[in-house]
């Protein structure tokens, strides 16, 4: 039988079943009935003269033929989605730019980074979404986002088709309400309970490692992703809290808050992550080519 032609709808349904791990999951994603999906898969199997899946418990696992077909199908549909993305953003009267922001990052710094994407006289429709680095990376790989601003880079050798550009980094400071602890920094961190960024963030993990390296026996009262909320909660409980040193410009204006120490070797990092297909996107180019050195300059006491 000649295989010079193939029904790409059948291949598309197979691709979804493989990714979802079940017919039911693919049916829900495609808003179709499981019976419809099953019929399409059978038609493709007849065309290819072989089984694409085998049963494993209640789910499915691909056969050797299924693995082979998926590798090609994944490249095909990923490439077609990239084509549609590029065509769509070129045709939009307002340039659509979907950005995911890691929820642990400083909103002030992120807003300044995103400001580079906006140019007077060039229409743009910016849409921002907050989530964890892992969730945003998954959405980026599914073409649901154009770029991610995150606190950690990606390894391009491990994440095929994705690129990471370092935007900048800044040190962190420890703050508390007056009066400050009596002991010098960093020993004073043992005098009061601490509020730190969540340990699922890169900065949170760095701080925990730093406490250990300093031999500090600290008590963690809470973990917060939002610096403003951390500051407010810290004031209520007389706790020491952490914020980027750049926030000093604001905190110095608050006479009730005092900076008790800085850690210059524990940095909060900022990285722009995007797919290869977005390299020519004007907003991506502007963000990646902007000089942010002034933005990340440390505050002066």
From Swiss-Prot:
One of its GO terms (molecular function) is DNA-binding transcription factor activity. GO terms for biological process: positive regulation of DNA-templated transcription initiation; regulation of DNA-templated transcription initiation. The keyword Methyltransferase does not apply. Its main location: cytoplasm. InterPro entries: LysR_subst-bd, Tscrpt_reg_HTH_LysR, WH-like_DNA-bd_sf, WH_DNA-bd_sf. It is found in: Cytoplasm. Disulfide bonds: none annotated. Residues 6-63 form the HTH lysR-type domain. One of its GO terms (cellular component) is cytoplasm. It comes from the Bacteria. Pfam families: HTH_1, LysR_substrate. Residues 23-42 bind DNA. Keywords: Activator, Cytoplasm, DNA-binding, Transcription, Transcription regulation. Plays a role in the positive regulation of NhaA. Belongs to the LysR transcriptional regulatory family. This is Transcriptional activator protein NhaR.
């Amino acid at each position: 039988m000649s295989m010079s032609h193939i029904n790409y709808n059948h291949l598309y349904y197979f691709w979804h079943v493989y990714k979802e791990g079940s017919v039911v999951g693919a049916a829900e994603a495609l808003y179709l009935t499981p019976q419809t999906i099953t019929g399409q898969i059978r038609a493709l199997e007849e065309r290819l003269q072989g089984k694409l899946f085998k049963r494993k418990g209640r789910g499915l696992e691909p056969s050797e033929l299924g693995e082979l077909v998926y590798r090609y199908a994944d490249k095909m549909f990923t490439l077609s989605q990239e084509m549609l993305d590029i065509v769509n953003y070129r045709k939009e009267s307002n340039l659509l730019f979907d950005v995911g922001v890691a929820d642990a990052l400083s909103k002030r710094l992120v807003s300044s980074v995103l400001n580079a994407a906006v140019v007077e006289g060039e229409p743009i429709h910016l849409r921002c979404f907050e989530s964890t680095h892992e969730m945003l990376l998954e959405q980026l790989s599914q073409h649901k986002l154009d770029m991610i601003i995150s606190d950690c880079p990606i390894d391009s050798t491990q994440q095929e088709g994705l690129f990471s550009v370092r935007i900048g980094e800044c040190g962190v400071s420890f703050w508390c309400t007056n009066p400050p602890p009596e002991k010098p920094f960093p020993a004073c961190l043992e005098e009061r309970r601490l509020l730190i960024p969540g340990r699922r963030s890169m900065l949170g993990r760095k701080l925990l490692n730093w406490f250990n390296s300093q031999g500090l026996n600290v008590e963690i009262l809470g973990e917060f992703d939002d610096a403003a909320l951390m500051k407010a909660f810290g004031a209520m409980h007389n706790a020491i809290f952490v914020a980027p040193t750049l926030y000093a410009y604001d905190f110095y204006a608050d006479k009730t808050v005092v900076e008790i120490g800085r850690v210059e070797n524990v940095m909060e990092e900022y990285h722009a992550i995007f797919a290869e297909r977005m390299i020519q996107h004007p907003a991506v180019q502007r963000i990646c080519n902007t000089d942010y050195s002034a933005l990340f300059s440390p505050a002066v006491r």
